[in-house]
Amino acid sequence: VAASSALPTTSSGTTAGAAGAPGVPEPARQHTKAGAIAFAEHYIGLINSVGQEPKVGVLEPLALASCKSCDNFEGTIKYFVAHKQRFDGPQYKIKKSNVTGYSEIATFIRVEASEPAVSIVAASGSNVKRYPEVLKSVSIFRLDWRSGWRVVTIQGES
């Protein structure tokens, strides 16, 4: 790649035009279709990680306060922290993701995943509840760009 075709970087070393909440990986900070896909996949990855190692405040900066599905994920984590519980594995394994709509107003990402069998476990290691495997789960993310991607809604595909 010629030096003239490289994107300019800021003094912090991030690509010019990149934005987003702290901790969001570089590909998910781009205001592009690929950036939107990377952001939706990053959000699912965080759901998996905070489900297994619960920590409040990780998901909240990535979504609008009006996102009801996001509130549900955040509420589960708050409950886990308060009751010293966690998932014993990831809740989602992404199979494929693609853009289904892209405009200046909103971007829609379709994420197809499987849901492995997973248990909620107590600090003692005892099983609290077991969820069966779901082979196909499809979620439609509506993302808006507001100095970085933010989740507006997550809906199941009917």
Sequence positions of predicted segments:
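Core segments of small alpha/beta cavity-forming domains
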Residues: 16-87
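Amphipathic, hydrophobic N-terminal targeting peptides for secretion and organelle import
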Residues: 1-21
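Exposed beta-sheet edge and beta->alpha loop/turn motif
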Residues: 1, 101-158
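A short, amphipathic edge element
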Residues: 82-100
